[in-house]
């Protein structure tokens, strides 16, 4: 009987090892696929960076769920690069490791960058002038204020409010 128990335990161990390896392989494949997709998006689209927070993401046109799954999204109808109020949004969730998780750590005076898709990858440097928490229905943050600014919007971690970071254009190079 002891020999039979050993065979069962050994067989169970082999089966568990096989399934464990398969599960890990699936997750590794998904992570690698997502990383490769993200690299392609960074190469083909406008890029947004906040070096102090280790944020570097592509900016896709529109804020639909498909765009926001992998990137920040530009609110259609708001400014263009270096002109007006260029507004972008991205997800925040410490549980799911989303792109704007650390947005609440931004400080006045920090720099944010947008990189164009042109041949020279023109850099737009914005200096943070404001961080605030607003009601989800506060759409006035999307308004044109007559200056050249970047507005970054994301949920608070609990999703009840919106974090808003405003930076004023300092340089185009």
What kind of region is each of these model predictions?
Residues 1-3:
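Juxtamembrane low-complexity tails/linkers enriched in Ser/Thr-Pro and polybasic
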């Amino acid at each position: 009987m002891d020999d039979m128990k050993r065979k069962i335990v050994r067989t169970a161990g082999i089966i568990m090892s096989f399934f464990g390896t398969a599960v890990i392989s699936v997750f590794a494949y998904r992570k690698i696929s997502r990383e490769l997709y993200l690299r392609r998006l960074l190469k083909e689209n406008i890029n947004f960076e906040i070096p102090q927070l280790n944020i570097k993401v592509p900016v896709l046109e529109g804020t639909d769920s498909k765009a926001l799954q992998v990137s920040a999204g530009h609110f259609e109808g708001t400014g263009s690069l270096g002109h007006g109020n260029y507004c972008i949004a991205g997800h925040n969730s410490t549980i799911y490791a989303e792109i704007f998780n650390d947005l609440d750590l931004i400080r006045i005076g920090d720099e944010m960058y947008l990189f164009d898709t042109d041949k020279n990858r023109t850099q737009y440097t914005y200096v943070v002038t404001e961080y605030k928490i607003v009601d989800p229905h506060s759409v006035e943050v999307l308004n044109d204020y007559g200056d050249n600014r970047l507005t970054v919007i994301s949920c608070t971690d609990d999703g009840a409010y919106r974090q808003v970071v405003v930076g004023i254009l300092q340089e185009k190079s």
